Amino acid sequence: THETDEIPDEQTQQTGFKVSGTKLLDANGNEFIMRGINHPHSWFTAQDDTALEAIAATGANTVRIVCGSGQQYNKDSVESLNKLTDKCKELEMIAILEVHDVTGKDDTSLLETAADYWIEVKEALIGKENYVILNIANEWVGNWDGQKWCDGYTSVIPRLREAGIKNTIIVDAAGWGQYGQSVTDYGEQVFAADPDANTMFSVHMYGTAGKNKATIARNLKLSTDKGLCMIVGEFGW
């Protein structure tokens, strides 16, 4: 794992993080292995600085931050997002921003609305490609419908790119993030929908995807065997 305090030169700063096969490369072109913690900003906004400082103190190089688009949770403004990402940069952590409002929802229009939100606040993303990653929506698609998951993301990813958002994108698996097979079956199509070829995938390991060693290995290996970049975005029970 490479620390994030190396200052990229001007040229590589413009490209930021980049997916390369099964690996994520940082702005210096080094493989970046995430070690991080989730922070529920939307529900504990007054504790952001305290929480982020405590997370950094663990040695984490990444923090995944719960944000709100206004559909269900309080809407984060550009200023709110900037404050979060600036603090992460100060603490030498990569910020992963995700919208939590569509968690477990199966309606494609809600994913489109999440994409609309990111386009609205794109000023908080553009120019920060070397320390901000975009996790479009937390656990969109609650059922095990890989085709719907694929159709939704192949629709919104090009829209985000057309809006000028160049940050690395993370897409959570279907089935509340636990249906890794959706990535195995359709991940290549979702990746191909990104004109920047800079999309990676995440599976959330709870009682289904993380129930035992064999299941954990299968949920990761079947996708990486197809050349896709995978992370575990959440885990617990």
Short names for language-model regions:
Residues 48-104, 111-116, 154, 158-163:
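Aromatic-lined substrate-binding rim segments of carbohydrate-active enzymes
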Residues 16, 45, 115-119, 123-133, ...:
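Extracellular glycoside hydrolase catalytic/binding regions
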Residues 34, 64-68, 96-100, 135-137, ...:
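Short beta-strands and strand-loop turn motifs
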Residues 68-72, 101-109, 137-143, 204-207:
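The substrate-binding groove and active-site-proximal loops of carbohydrate-active enzymes
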Residues 3-62:
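N-terminal carbohydrate-binding accessory modules
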Residues 12-26, 46-51, 81-88, 92-94, ...:
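Short, charge-rich amphipathic segments
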Residues 42-44, 68-72, 176:
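Short active-site-proximal "capping" loops at secondary-structure junctions
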